């Protein structure tokens, strides 16, 4: 199995720290609003990675955090006349509701930043003691000048990174030794949530949170760290700097970054105002369709969010569902053909989780199933791919029985050449969104 490592910009053979086990950390949301489709891309992409690793037999310890203390949370809580805890818990609950609907497997743990404040203070103090960090009027900053290969993850020089960071480095530069230095601890402001630390009351900076939660729960070195491509700098760059300064060990063996969801050629983001929340979208779009749309493009590639793309996803799901509905578990099949499908799917996915190539194999498999191939082994592989994709079909047995009865009545009408009755039943089914197919093996049906 190979993974594209952002740090080296190369495909690398995947060798976990402990054979058969994977330690994986994915940056989660800052919980001040509903997640939008762009946020969901990262959640779904790494859910697919996790599920494929499990399919391949790995035991995955999967950690994804909630940032529940932040300027946006503080401001949102004030505007809503709520505590920061109640405000963030509202959107944590919404996150679970949205991601459950998208059939995302719950993380092994979803730590909250506020649960690790003491550990963050200890982490920062150690950096101060080692002179990797310094105190300035109650704030604590990391000395970037002491970090070896600081800009390597983003594959740029430091000057370029600072120029392209879209204001994210815009802190109180007058308190810093260098404009490149970043905050580990921010001194308390009036009417803001704060904690007591050796340098005075305050709260942690954004970057320290993930380093502390990752090393606390997974250890000093982990296998995979994932997140959106926009996190390469400064967030992941700073995570590496502060973590390796503290531990003296390599922080992450494989860095993975997903591509953006684009709208009219621009990244979907709250700052641009061109976003659609998952909460809103699921009022009008089946969660399966959104899941399929997000899951079936290779994770490193951008995806364009359009009505046509959702329609294409819906049509493809219908084809897959139709094949799955009519799969005969009692049928006999050429198992060597099934083995070829399975091996080809694994070969595609083993190349940096290339689901786009994997889907080409899967669509060929679906066509093969539609030709009458079935049996328990065929159903097992079908189920395994659906699990990786995060698709679950729920067939309403009572409704299915009613449809089958109408189909049988239509067949009897055809046998006695009562074509008017036959057409009447067909039209009645079509009005319910049921399309009939007359095949040499009998009548099959699927939903429009």
From Swiss-Prot:
Top EC class of this enzyme: ligase
Gene Ontology process terms (BP): cysteinyl-tRNA aminoacylation
SUPFAM superfamilies attached to this UniProt entry: Anticodon-binding domain of a subclass of class I aminoacyl-tRNA synthetases, Nucleotidylyl transferase
Keywords, sorted A to Z: Aminoacyl-tRNA synthetase, ATP-binding, Cytoplasm, Ligase, Metal-binding, Nucleotide-binding, Protein biosynthesis, Zinc
A Pfam family this chain is assigned to: tRNA-synt_1e
Catalytic activity annotation: tRNA(Cys) + L-cysteine + ATP = L-cysteinyl-tRNA(Cys) + AMP + diphosphate
Subcellular location: Cytoplasm
Binding site for Zn(2+): 27, 210, 235, 239
Entry note: cofactor: Binds 1 zinc ion per subunit.
Residue window of motif 'HIGH' region: 29-39
Reported cofactor(s): Zn(2+)
GO molecular function, one term: mannan binding
InterPro entries named among the record's database cross-references: Cys-tRNA-ligase (IPR015803), Cys-tRNA-synt_Ia_DALR (IPR015273), Cys-tRNA/MSH_ligase (IPR024909), CysS_C (IPR056411), Rossmann-like_a/b/a_fold (IPR014729), tRNA-synt_1_cat_dom (IPR032678), tRNAsynth_Ia_anticodon-bd (IPR009080)
Keyword Zinc appears in the UniProt entry: yes
Family according to the record: Belongs to the class-I aminoacyl-tRNA synthetase family.
Subunit (UniProt): Monomer.
Protein name, as recorded: Cysteine--tRNA ligase
Organism for this UniProt entry: Lactococcus lactis subsp. lactis (strain IL1403)
Lineage of the organism: Bacteria, Bacillati, Bacillota, Bacilli, Lactobacillales
């Amino acid at each position: 199995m190979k993974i594209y490592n952002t740090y080296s910009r190369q495909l690398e053979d995947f060798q976990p720290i402990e054979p058969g086990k994977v330690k994986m950390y994915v940056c989660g949301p800052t919980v001040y609003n509903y997640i939008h489709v762009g946020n969901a891309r990262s959640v779904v992409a790494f859910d697919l990675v996790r599920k494929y690793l499990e399919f391949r037999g790995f035991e995955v310890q999967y950690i994804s955090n909630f940032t529940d203390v932040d300027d946006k949370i503080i401001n949102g809580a004030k505007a809503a006349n709520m505590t920061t805890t109640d405000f963030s818990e509202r959107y944590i609950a919404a996150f679970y509701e949205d991601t459950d609907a998208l059939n995302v497997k719950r993380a092994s743990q979803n730590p909250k930043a506020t649960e690790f404040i003491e550990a963050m203070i200890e982490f920062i103090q150690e950096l101060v003691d080692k002179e990797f960090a310094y105190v300035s009027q109650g704030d604590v900053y990391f000395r970037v000048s002491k970090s070896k290969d600081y800009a390597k993850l983003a594959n740029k020089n430091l000057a370029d990174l600072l120029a392209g960071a879209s204001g994210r480095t815009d802190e109180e530069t007058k308190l810093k030794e260098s404009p490149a230095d970043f905050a580990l601890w921010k001194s308390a402001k009036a009417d803001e949530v704060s904690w007591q630390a050796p340098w005075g009351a305050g709260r942690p900076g954004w970057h320290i949170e993930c380093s502390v939660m990752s090393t606390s729960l997974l250890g000093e070195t982990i296998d995979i760290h994932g997140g959106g491509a926009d996190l390469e700098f400064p967030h992941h760059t700073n995570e590496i700097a502060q973590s390796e300064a503290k531990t003296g060990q390599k922080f992450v063996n494989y860095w993975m970054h997903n591509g953006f969801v684009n709208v009219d050629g621009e990244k979907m983001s709250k700052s641009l105002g061109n976003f659609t929340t998952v909460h809103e979208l699921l009022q009008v779009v089946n969660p399966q369709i959104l899941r399929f749309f997000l899951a079936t493009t290779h994770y490193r590639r951008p995806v364009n969010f359009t009505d046509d793309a959702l329609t294409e996803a819906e049509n493809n799901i219908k084809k897959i569902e139709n094949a799955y509905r009519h799969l005969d578990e009692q049928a006999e099949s050429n198992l060597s053909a099934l083995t070829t499908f399975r091996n080809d799917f694994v070969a595609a996915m083993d190349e940096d989780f290339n689901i786009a190539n994997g889907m080409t194999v899967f669509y060929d498999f679906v066509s093969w199933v539609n030709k009458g191939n079935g049996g328990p082994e065929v159903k097992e592989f079908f189920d395994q791919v659906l699990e990786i994709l995060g698709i679950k079909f729920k067939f309403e047995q009572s409704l299915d029985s009613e449809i089958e009865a109408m189909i049988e009545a239509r067949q009897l009408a055809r046998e006695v050449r009562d074509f008017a009755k036959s057409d009447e039943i067909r039209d009645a089914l079509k009005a319910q969104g049921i399309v009939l197919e007359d095949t040499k093996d009998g009548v099959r049906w699927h939903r429009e």
